[in-house]
Amino acid sequence: MALLTKATRKKWFKYLGLGEYNKTNILKMQRMYFKNPKDQDGVYGKDTDRLLRHLHHTKAYTTSFAPFEFACPCGKCTGYPTWMRAKELKHIQKIRNHYGVPMKITSALRCPSYNARVGGVDDSAHLSGYAVDFYMKGVTDTLEERKSAINYIRKLANHDFSYCNGYNSYGRKVSAPRMGNAVHTQTK
């Protein structure tokens, strides 16, 4: 994947309120989002490019979420091993709007190491920014509520697959106890 053009970077820095596109503001952005000091060097490379794409997409395609809510929680990677894709962000925003209650993201972006640690499949959509696991109070508390939510979600444009502990979007029983009361949804 090629880095964003310098013209696009300048435009997106302005759109995101990050100031002029320069080394000082690149470093400021890195310090805001990258947890490890080793990733905070003021250099615009692949990691920073993925972060900028993620920041842009989160602002452009959602109104209810902050960029950090999607970060990989492993503490070893930058937190942004890829970026959330526009289709998935639009998808979860529609779900959030439909139910009208806050959505807690329980898992979104994952680096390969964290994905393996939590038992994710090798080709998990979390690795490419096309999946989110979430919990919504009063919407996903019981199996019946989660089934109802999945049946709504599967009718949305670009839906690929959803599941929870006890059910999936094909109407089959699923054993996924690690999911708790969360629902997984992914787009294609």
Regions found by a protein language model. Give the residues of each.
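Short acidic, glycine/serine/threonine-rich helix-capping segments at coil-helix boundaries
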Residues: 2-53
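Second-shell loop/turn segments in exported
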Residues: 12-18, 37-40, 74-85, 136-140, ...
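Structured segments of extracytoplasmic/periplasmic soluble domains
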Residues: 15, 28-36, 54-58, 94-98, ...
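Surface-exposed patches in mature extracellular/periplasmic domains of secreted proteins
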Residues: 39-41, 101-109, 161-170
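A mature extracytoplasmic/lumenal domain signature
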Residues: 44, 107-109, 136-138
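Active-site acidic/histidine clusters and adjacent loop/turn architecture
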Residues: 51-100
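Extended, low-complexity, intrinsically disordered C-terminal regulatory tails
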Residues: 90-119
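Catalytic cores and adjacent binding grooves of peptidoglycan-active enzymes
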Residues: 121-188
